[in-house]
Amino acid sequence: MMTLQQLLPNTTLPATAAGVVLSGLQLDSRKVMPGDAFLAVQGVASDGRQFVSQAIAAGAVAVLAEAETFSVQQEQAVPRVNFPGLSRSVGELAARWYGEPGSAMNVVGVTGTNGKTSITWFLRDALNALGHRCALVGTLGLGLKDNEQITGHTTPDPITLQAGLARVLEAGADTVAMEVSSHALDQHRLGPTPVSVAVFSNLSRDHLDYHGDMEAYLAAKSVLFTRDGVKLAVINCDDPVAYSLVGCLADGVRCVTFGDQTGATVRCASVAFTAEGTNAELNVGGESFSVTLPLFGRFNLSNLMAVAGILHGQGVSTDSLAGALAAITPVPGRMEPVQQAGCPTVIVDYAHTPDGLEKALQACRAHFAGRLFCIIGCGGDRDTGKRPQMAAVAERGADHVVFTSDNPRSEDPQKIIDEMCAGLTDTGSVQIIVERDRAVMDTVQAASDGDVILLAGKGHEDYQEVNGVRYPSDDRDLAHKAFNARGGAQ
């Protein structure tokens, strides 16, 4: 509980408003409970100021909005406060409400187009093996291991984030491995949460429907590395923008690099890819050791090196580091094999960018010897410019390609596929099966038991989103159903 004046210590309020006791903060008028303060933020998709009356009807006892027409008047039963820059300040307000929980933990923020989920997942496993209690914030949820709560976003809204940080702190977390999206950085979702370690995985085309161009996309990512409190930066030195990020670091920030370059702090001395995973020799700070893990793809080796860099940069010895990396487990829906005797191997992966798809296809080639099938679609109401690029990557990288649906949302699935086809050199080179379940079924039937099928785009997701409705659909379940229909051994 907190008064309105305590929430807004730098705002002059009438006594009747200042003493209003709040029981919670809410951004969504539909979720307002009696006693809450409603923060009517003007967002990208909707404007909270249009729902003030609904929030008050639901029991809101105060309303904050960026609106000059708002003023606190003595006679108002529900104080309405004009708060300039509210959208940029929600994180600060939420952190104040929850007691700034991030300040009591070591927060590691990971940004980049691809790899955020895997790096944070691997880091949590490794830190837990070292005796820490590390919480996860990202695509797969917010929480300690096996107690994640799905938030619906890579980086949740500021109130959900601070509430989650408070929850994991109370549960004993000492470290947080957080995915930090470009949207979150641009929208100030982290608020004042101190990030002590900033990590960069890579940069390739994505989210240009939001950022407009790659320069703005990079600028949003760069914000993570210029935040106050960053003590360690861990950067993929193989990416062309790496040294741009190094150049923006403040004096005194230690920089650890990982990649294939000779001068990298963390690099791979040798690697062998098998149908069971990856065997690699890593060199970390001049010392070498071997790791064998059930991980697929060179990009996962890069993710592994990022984690090694984070731990090395925080003083973990090589011996302890080797043991911690050995405890890493595969990420659900990230190069996840689904197998059944007598059937082709299906690899379920979240790849939904041209670069991510290309790397997933390359991984399948490296680990498996049979023909390579690729089932791919593109999400509706998202960056349309990458659709032909995704198609071109699939055509170039696979032996057989099937275009299908992938969360069409409000768009016509066939229209999305038609736009993908613009990137093909031969439109007759692909098969089009709009229904995703049928695409999986038919492809499993067509492939041989020594072949591999990359089922890309949805990964861990357990739904297909059509016109605002999320229908149950899990690619792993679709693969098992296709195996059973084919008659593979149980």
Curated annotation (Swiss-Prot):
Swiss-Prot/TrEMBL catalytic activity: UDP-N-acetyl-alpha-D-muramoyl-L-alanyl-D-glutamate + meso-2,6-diaminopimelate + ATP = UDP-N-acetyl-alpha-D-muramoyl-L-alanyl-gamma-D-glutamyl-meso-2,6-diaminopimelate + ADP + phosphate + H(+)
Enzyme class: ligase
GO molecular function: ATP binding; magnesium ion binding; UDP-N-acetylmuramoylalanyl-D-glutamate-2,6-diaminopimelate ligase activity
The protein's annotated pathway: Cell wall biogenesis; peptidoglycan biosynthesis
Modified residues (N6-carboxylysine): K221
GO biological process: cell division; cell wall organization; peptidoglycan biosynthetic process; regulation of cell shape
Cross-referenced Pfam families: Mur_ligase, Mur_ligase_C, Mur_ligase_M
UniProt superkingdom: Bacteria
Swiss-Prot/TrEMBL cofactor(s): Mg(2+)
Residues engaged in binding UDP-N-acetyl-alpha-D-muramoyl-L-alanyl-D-glutamate: L27, S29, T154, T155, S181, Q187, R189
PTM comment text: Carboxylation is probably crucial for Mg(2+) binding and, consequently, for the gamma-phosphate positioning of ATP.
InterPro entries: Mur-like_cat_sf, Mur_ligase_C, Mur_ligase_C_dom_sf, Mur_ligase_cen, Mur_ligase_N, MurE/MurF_N, UDP-N-AcMur-Glu-dNH2Pim_ligase
Keywords, alphabetical: ATP-binding, Cell cycle, Cell division, Cell shape, Cell wall biogenesis/degradation, Cytoplasm, Ligase, Magnesium, Nucleotide-binding, Peptidoglycan synthesis
Assigned EC number: 6.3.2.13
The protein's role, per its UniProt record: Catalyzes the addition of meso-diaminopimelic acid to the nucleotide precursor UDP-N-acetylmuramoyl-L-alanyl-D-glutamate (UMAG) in the biosynthesis of bacterial cell-wall peptidoglycan.
Entry protein name: UDP-N-acetylmuramoyl-L-alanyl-D-glutamate--2,6-diaminopimelate ligase
